[in-house]
Structures are given as structure tokens and as C-alpha cells.
């Protein structure tokens, strides 16, 4: 699942910035990739996925899924989007559920 791959790649605070972004980029929507390029991985407060994903869907928008993961910094959410039915899922955002 794309959300699982993305959260594992995201939560690597010791990874050099360029490598971190290059490995994460294929899973990101273009708009989110612009923002993610400026994230400093050293500031990401988790490096372990403890459980998940717990998926939440929107009955009004089947091309939107939230995947929640428990990490060693609490719950984090990966927002997944699909352009159209059958298209690949891409990450539209990753963030702490506490924010």
C-alpha cells in the first residue's frame, strides 16, 4: 500500500535531506511534493511505525482515503488521493493527528 511505503520513508529523521526527498517523491502528488521538498527530515519526531494503517474513507468522495498510523510519536495521518477511479493513489499530505 502506498500509504505504508510513504509513512515508512517519511519517518527517517537520520536520512540526508536529498536522499529522503528523492525516495519519498515518487509517492507524492505534485502539489504536496513542492511543500515536502522543504521538510527537514531531522525534525520529524518519529522513526518507528507501531501499527496501522487504519483506513478512513469518505462516502461522498471515493478518491480520498485517510490512513492513520500509530508511531513512537503518537498517531500520524497519510492523506491519499486518486485523480479518477482506477488511477494510482498518491500522497496529498502527511501530518500528526495532534495538529
Mark where each language-model region is:
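Core segments of small alpha/beta cavity-forming domains
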Residues: 1-39
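A short, amphipathic edge element
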Residues: 38-60
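General N-terminal targeting signals
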Residues: 27, 44, 50, 84-86
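Residue-level signal for well-ordered alpha-helical segments
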Residues: 1, 5, 9, 44-46, ...
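Exposed beta-sheet edge and beta->alpha loop/turn motif
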Residues: 56-99
Amino acid at each position: 500500500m502506498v500509504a505504508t511505503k510513504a509513512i515508512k520513508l517519511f519517518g527517517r529523521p537520520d536520512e540526508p535531506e536529498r536522499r529522503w526527498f528523492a525516495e519519498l517523491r515518487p509517492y507524492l502528488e505534485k502539489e504536496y511534493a513542492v511543500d515536502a521538498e522543504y521538510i527537514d527530515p531531522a525534525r520529524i519526531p518519529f522513526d518507528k511505525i507501531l501499527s496501522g494503517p487504519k483506513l478512513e474513507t469518505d462516502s461522498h468522495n471515493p478518491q480520498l482515503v485517510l490512513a492513520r498510523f500509530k508511531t513512537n510519536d503518537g498517531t500520524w495521518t497519510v492523506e491519499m488521493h486518486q485523480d479518477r477511479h482506477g488511477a494510482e493513489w498518491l500522497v496529498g499530505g502527511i501530518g500528526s493527528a495532534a495538529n
